[in-house]
Amino acid sequence: MTIAILPARLANQIAAGEVVERPASVIKELIENSLDAGATSIHIDVDKGGIKKIKITDNGHGIVKEELTLALSRHATSKIKSLNDLEAIGSLGFRGEALASISSVARLTLTSKPQSQATAWQAVAEGRDMSVNIKPAAHPDGTSIEVLDLFFNTPARRKFLRTEKTEFNHIDEVVRRIALAHFEVSFSLTHNGNTVRQYRMASTHAQCIKRVAMVCGPKFIEHAVEVDCPHDNMTLSGWLAKPSFSRSQNDLCYSYVNGRMMRDKLINHAIRQAYADLLPPDTYPAFVLFLQLDHREVDVNVHPSKHEVRFHQSRYVHDFIYSVCHKALTSALAGEELFTTADSDLALVPEQSYSSLGANDRQGSHSSNTPTLNYPSADYIRPLQHVNDASNSQSTSSYSGYGQQHKTNAISKIAASNYQALMTPDKGSSAQVQNTSGSDQASAQKHETTTLQNSTDQSAFLSVHQPGYALYKTENGVRVLSLFKLAKSTYGKLVEQSWQNKTEQSDCPVECLVSQPLLLPVILSLSEQQLSFVLAEQEILSNAGIVFIQQHKNKIQIRQFPALLREQDVSNALIIIIEELIEKRSFTEGEALCETNLHQSIGLAMVLAEYDETQADILLRLTKKLFHEQLSQQLLLNSIPLDLTSHIKTLF
């Protein structure tokens, strides 16, 4: 077969296969042309779901008579002139093929009048050779484009169109998406002569919120968190719905790049990752987000429908979006309970998460008496992994961040007999240990310490009970371990070793932790006491990896933070560190802080609010790695004996 150049009409119809998928894609292209023309009012009129008629009317700059024919030609555009323009596209359209493609599969009429022109002129594309006829017309300033009988000359394409209702729903969605990105423009949509949508121009912030509520619903605004974060040459703004407004489908996921509506995988992944631990499975977030950045930093010429883009610094953009969204969500949800979980009956007073305690609360806990026990309602049969086997096997129970399975309050006879078999002490066992005098108790504890140190493997962990307590078996009975206290000791040791390793590997004589620059500096408000403390101890905090500057009278801007705390909320972690150091300095009557104080305070900030079985397993492995043969001693020091035998007997 010989090679031949395709006829213009056939070439345009092939191009239309990418540009014109359905009536909604025609409307998208025409509205974007109106926006590029500077229109502030756009009216969309459709009949029969856009299959019979589509008419777009705007008040934009218009097209002069001499360029009407050219406007219907392929690759004819006023938006780019050179390769430099293509690399920094600021308009919504730029390829110059939409009108030519549409006119090749429909009957198109273009009427336009620039303000500088006395009369309006109309261009009609018709015939097999797509000849354009020009004639005068009556029309106000602006442009109207009428598209009749879409796909009339391509029956195969027309056959794939859906019902009138379905096609109009796609049109409605396109108009809604575009209306969200252009508050400065009024939009109206009519279908079969009936007005369906009417969005007035929004010039104030309140009017913008009103439009968002009209598009996404008032409940979205009620549950939304507003964000507006500039950073370098990027700005992310818009609204994020709290996880309580999660959706069963992704019908309220609106993202825009430089005013262009997107379904970009990178953007969606960053947003989904920010919601990752907050949403129940099989649900979707709701958001309206606008990303503004330098046009030279994004390539929009990578997708036929321009729904996807390519960022020159994709990882940087991804992390920026994730950081802003995650920070906004966690800040908004601070103090809120995201999901309902089963209540635990375990009450060890005054134990709480060290991360949630203030300095006064923690100080009070040091002088508290031995806590009383209310035994938990739990399945005593399910064991936790043995600490020595933890690295070789997975957790025996699955943990979900959004809730727990409700546990039965009944203790089966099998469970009771299992625990009865575990309890094999001699006379004067754990019950006696609790009731002995001070000297006898010290002697018993010393004996148990020696026994545990000689046989670490004889400690078997049985189960974990939230918020952070574990039962484990020793030769002398069952003990209740505070995972909070154990974590404080373990993380303090981890920070200490990290400090020493950094000092040994660095040529710098100044001891310092590995510091990690923050992608987005964090602004933190401090009390007068806290501010005076951090300013006075700025040098030692800097050595520990905490770098900040004073921004306002009572605010600091955190720029770098210890890498060990990368998983923690920066603001909360720093408050914990500051309060702990202030408390320690008050105990030492104003003496200079030492390295150990820093180790302990940073370790305290790493303690979680609660521990499930997986997190407890990780903590125990880390404790064993850091303390080696002292593991059993650490377990003993952070636990109390439990007389489970007498408790089980009361159940029968």
UniProtKB/Swiss-Prot annotation:
GO cellular component terms, semicolon-separated: mismatch repair complex
Alphabetical keyword list: DNA damage, DNA repair
Entry superkingdom: Bacteria
Disordered, as annotated region: 357-377, 425-457
GO biological process: mismatch repair
Gene3D superfamilies: 3.30.230.10, Histidine kinase-like ATPase, C-terminal domain, MutL, C-terminal domain, regulatory subdomain
Sample GO molecular function, one term: ATP-dependent DNA damage sensor activity
PANTHER family: DNA MISMATCH REPAIR PROTEIN MLH, PMS, MUTL (PTHR10073), DNA MISMATCH REPAIR PROTEIN MLH1 (PTHR10073:SF12)
Functional description taken from the UniProt entry: This protein is involved in the repair of mismatches in DNA. It is required for dam-dependent methyl-directed DNA mismatch repair. May act as a 'molecular matchmaker', a protein that promotes the formation of a stable complex between two or more DNA-binding proteins in an ATP-dependent manner without itself being part of a final effector complex.
Protein name as it appears in the record: DNA mismatch repair protein MutL
Organism of derivation: Colwellia psychrerythraea (strain 34H / ATCC BAA-681)
Lineage: Bacteria, Pseudomonadati, Pseudomonadota, Gammaproteobacteria, Alteromonadales
